[in-house]
UniProtKB/Swiss-Prot annotation:
pH-linked activity: Optimum pH is between 8.5 and 9.0.
Organism: Homo sapiens (Human)
Cofactor (UniProt): Zn(2+)
InterPro entries the UniProt entry points to: Alkaline_phosphatase_core_sf, DNA/RNA_non-sp_Endonuclease_sf, Endo_G_ENPP1-like_dom, ENPP1-3/EXOG-like_nuc-like, His-Me_finger_sf, Phosphodiest/P_Trfase, Somatomedin_B-like_dom_sf, Somatomedin_B_dom
All residue ranges annotated as the SMB domain in the record: 50-93, 94-138
PROSITE patterns assigned: SMB_1 (PS00524), SMB_2 (PS50958)
Protein name: Ectonucleotide pyrophosphatase/phosphodiesterase family member 3
Residues that, per the record, bind Zn(2+) 1: D167, T205, D372, H373
Length: 875
């Protein structure tokens, strides 16, 4: 038994041991072979290097190597070059980086950069010389620096600013392909970045690049597209013509001029406008555009500018790459070409950061890496042809593509007489599956700020995502990628990353618009910005120590209180309410307008939780009207409320509100008849009816609705517009209040007859009164404000607010939504969403200033005001 057990256990041990011995022997034998070969090869290579290598012998005519090989210029012709001549003497002159083979090389005058031992002294090292040849840690491998102070070498008193644009780098690339872009991804990780940066409309290259360096909307700086016509100049602008260098096209003050006007030098390595004598001046240093210049050469040149003596060295720099835009156009955003382009630009960006580190500037320079717009896929089966809508098209000219405009063909003769209204009518609601909406340019969403410029043609087509609108089927420029679309499309979102001593580290911020970058760069340079469309201070949260501290605007026109003198009106103003049978009943409901101080305090707390809007217009006589359910600011000259504010709570029950009393209007006894609207204004046979700024149906009791059925709450509305207005307040407003735990509502009329995005002066409005006493608003605004923390109501919100502003065009028809045969539920919400806006847009159009009593830093209030809600969820 014992013997059997011994045999049974010993046998496997012997087999395993033998197997291990065999493996060990094979491995040892292999190692001996490798060592022998390695030793032999090593000795041989050293012998070859000693006797037949061109290392440190390039173009030395006297050198004779192994078997009399040569390294001079003529060796290729003779056929006697040493074995490594091509790699050592030729290829080394074509690359921008060092490698171990190049380290310590003999200086080659034809080299793009040097890896010789004296290159640091002569300031011509390749960007990675120290990390490759001297063993220093590369920028990519180095940990994120968290120093609080600038780490600038001697001679750099203040951090330089580099503005780096990679054309067409859509924000989504940064997350989808991050592992393929280690350098850019490190900048994102170590510095500050936004989820995306919003481009201006149209999302094209020239308009957005010039917006970035001026802080102006395209309508303000004049570069409204890559292609355009100016009737006053009677000239056409395009990227392929020399006309683009005519200063007459370029308005505003670009960043390089702002810096130069305040004693700084500026250098631009390509940027739209940089080779134009804007205001008679060029940048201190600039390069005429040449798209064939390698990216590495551009980077190398910028690094050399940083090596200039202090007195000659710029403080502001721009850098521009055409990629990944070019590859996106050719192959579409999801293509191998784009992936390759991203790797190429990442490598070049890494070269910049290595070059900065080599100069000890990597934690001294403030660098901003951004894009002008995104990119989307287009398809040849997603084309809208104007020949499908017009029997002939030879009478108009069309700028085709994702952001089409239409004007007269015969220019300048027919430019102003061209019937734009008829074109829009003929293109409206023609097909159930139409993939564009036609607009007269003044009717475009106000958030676009794309109207007030003679170069913006009056007919505009707002095209669906991935679709193109063109003249006819002869246009075959489809497929691949394109941009120019609605700037709310996610595919049009651009990147924004920043790094440097002035920026916070390892931080992600909410999206913002590229009009804000100009002010930010001025703060980095510690200079005063020129007037612009940005909101100075709204990006303070990107900086460790903000240079500029904003404050609330000072009120220009003070308010009064419309006092209660008599419960019975001195004039009826042609108003009538059959439900109030006698003067006693009339007196009773009017007495409800006479609030005590305690009641005023209570209504202000609930209905003005963030303070009353301040009036920034000059000479505006207005008074406050207090009610239990709402507060309004009444404009006496306009005879209507400028704004009305109230809070809609989250409904705790679903019981219906009391029915509204029909056909009941009365004069507000607090407002003199000479400053009030007459109800008879709405009785004439016209397309205008009255609407209520504060909806009577929102009152919680049947009696309190009488506070809203008064002349001081009346605003003129087109019949069709009122349908949409009433649906919003009766359905959508309740929905928002339910979802957000209550909302504060501020709404009012807008007058922008000259469609410049700013409130009209009184004389401008007077021109459009059309022989009536009541001016008709061009738009109405609604601003919904709730607490970001939905466990709090608006009136008890301790932290950040959430906003949802709308600016709705006031037009006689709803043709924009093609509502024929559709219930309001199918189109009203979409219309409001299409006209989403920023609070700042509302302020500009009304001359009002919001949230001044909200206890929060002003810079954070400005973040709120410049925030644009979005509804797009897919790319």
């Amino acid at each position: 038994m014992e013997s059997t057990l011994t045999l049974a256990t010993e046998q496997p041990v012997k087999k395993n041991t033998l197997k291990k011995y065999k493996i060990a022997c094979i491995v040892l034998l292999a190692l001996l072979v490798i060592m022998s070969l390695g030793l032999g090869l090593g000795l041989g290579l050293r012998k070859l290097e000693k006797q037949g290598s061109c290392r440190k012998k390039c173009f030395d005519a006297s050198f004779r190597g192994l078997e009399n090989c040569r390294c001079d210029v003529a060796c290729k012709d003779r056929g006697d070059c040493c074995w490594d001549f091509e790699d050592t003497c030729v290829e080394s002159t074509r690359i921008w980086m060092c490698n171990k083979f190049r380290c310590g090389e003999t200086r080659l005058e034809a080299s793009l950069c040097s890896c010789s031992d004296d290159c640091l002294q002569r300031k011509d090292c390749c960007a990675d010389y120290k990390s490759v040849c001297q063993g220093e840690t590369s920028w990519l491998e180095e940990n994120c620096d968290t120093a609080q102070q600038s780490q600038c070498p001697e001679g750099f008193d203040l951090p330089p600013v580099i503005l780096f644009s990679m054309d067409g780098f859509r924000a989504e690339y940064l997350y989808t392909w991050d592992t393929l872009m280690p350098n850019i991804n490190k900048l994102k990780t170590c510095g500050i970045h936004s989820k995306y940066m919003r481009a201006m409309y149209p999302t094209k290259t020239f308009p957005n690049h010039y917006t970035i360096v001026t802080g102006l909307y395209p309508e303000s700086h004049g570069i409204i597209d890559n292609n355009m016509y100016d009737v006053n100049l009677n000239k056409n602008f395009s990227l392929s013509s020399k006309e683009q260098n005519n200063p007459a096209w370029w308005h505003g003050q670009p960043m390089w001029l702002t810096a130069m006007y305040q004693g700084l030098k500026a250098a631009t390595y390509f940027w739209p406008g940089s080779e134009v004598a804007i205001n008679g001046s060029f940048p201190s240093i600039y390069m005429p555009y040449n798209g064939s210049v390698p990216f590495e050469e551009r980077i190398s040149t910028l690094l050399k500018w940083l090596d200039l003596p202090k007195a000659e060295r710029p403080r502001f720099y721009t850098m521009y790459f055409e990629e990944p835009d070019s590859s996106g156009h050719a192959g579409g955003p999801v293509s191998a070409r784009v992936i390759k382009a991203l790797q190429v630009v990442d490598h070049a960006f890494g070269m910049l950061m290595e070059g900065l580190k080599q100069r000890n500037l990597h934690n001294c320079v403030n660098i901003i890496l951004l894009a002008d717009h995104g990119m989307d896929q287009t398809y040849c089966n997603k084309m809208e042809y104007m020949t499908d809508y017009f029997p002939r098209i030879n009478f108009f000219y069309m700028y085709e593509g994702p952001a089409p405009r239409i004007r007269a063909h015969n220019i300048p003769h027919d430019f102003f007489s061209f019937n734009s209204e008829e074109i829009v009518r003929n293109l409206s609601c023609r097909k159930p599956d139409q993939h564009f909406k036609p607009y007269l340019t003044p009717d475009l969403p106000k958030r676009l700020h794309y109207a007030k410029n003679v170069r913006i043609d009056k007919v505009h087509l707002f095209v669906d995502q991935q679709w193109l609108a063109v003249r006819s089927k002869s246009n075959t420029n489809c497929g691949g990628g394109n941009h120019g679309y609605n700037n709310e499309f996610r595919s049009m979102e651009a990147i924004f990353l920043a790094h440097g001593p002035s920026f916070k580290e390892k931080t992600e911020v909410e999206p913002f618009e590229n009009i804000e970058v100009y002010n930010l760069m001025c703060d980095l340079l510690r200079i005063q910005p020129a007037p612009n469309n940005g909101t100075h201070g709204s990006l303070n949260h990107l900086l460790k120590v903000p240079f500029y501290e904003p404050s609330h605007a000072e009120e220009v026109s003070k308010f009064s209180v419309c006092g209660f003198a008599n419960p019975l009106p001195t004039e009826s103003l042609d108003c009538f309410c059959p439900h109030l049978q006698n003067s006693t009943q009339l007196e009773q409901v009017n007495q409800m307008l006479n609030l005590t101080q305690e009641e005023i305090t209570a209504t202000v707390k609930v209905n003005l939780p963030f303070g009353r809007p301040r009036v920034l217009q000059k000479n505006v006589d207005h008074c406050l009207l207090y009610h239990r359910e709402y507060v309004s600011g009444f404009g006496k000259a306009m005879r209507m409320p400028m704004w009305s504010s109230y809070t809609v709570p989250q409904l705790g029950d679903t019981s219906p509100l009391p029915p509204t009393v029909p056909d009941c209007l009365r004069a507000d006894v607090r407002v003199p008849p000479s400053e009030s609207q007459k109800c008879s204004f709405y009785l004439a046979d016209k397309n205008i009816t009255h609407g209520f700024l504060y909806p009577p149906a929102s009152n919680r009791t049947s009696d309190s609705q009488y506070d809203a059925l008064i002349t001081s709450n009346l605003v003129p509305m087109y019949e069709e517009f009122r349908k949409m207005w009433d649906y919003f307040h009766s359905v959508l407003l309740i929905k928002h209040a339910t979802e957000r735990n209550g909302v504060n509502v501020v709404s009012g009329p807008i007058f922008d007859y000259n469609y410049d995005g700013h409130f009209d002066a009184p004389d401008e409005i007077t021109k459009h009164l059309a022989n009536t006493d009541v001016p008709i608003p061009t738009h109405y605004f609604v601003v919904l404000t709730s607490c970001k923390n939905k466990s709090h109501t608006p009136e008890n919100c301790p932290g950040w607010l959430d906003v949802l502003p709308f600016i709705i065009p006031h037009r006689p028809t709803n043709v924009e939504s093609c509502p024929e045969g559709k219930p309001e539920a199918l189109w009203v919400e979409e219309r409001f969403t299409a006209h989403i806006a920023r609070v700042r847009d509302v302020e500009l159009l009304t001359g009002l200033d919001f949230y001044q009593d909200k206890v929060q830093p002003v810079s954070e209030i400005l973040q709120l005001k410049t925030y644009l809600p979005t509804f797009e969820t897919t790319i």
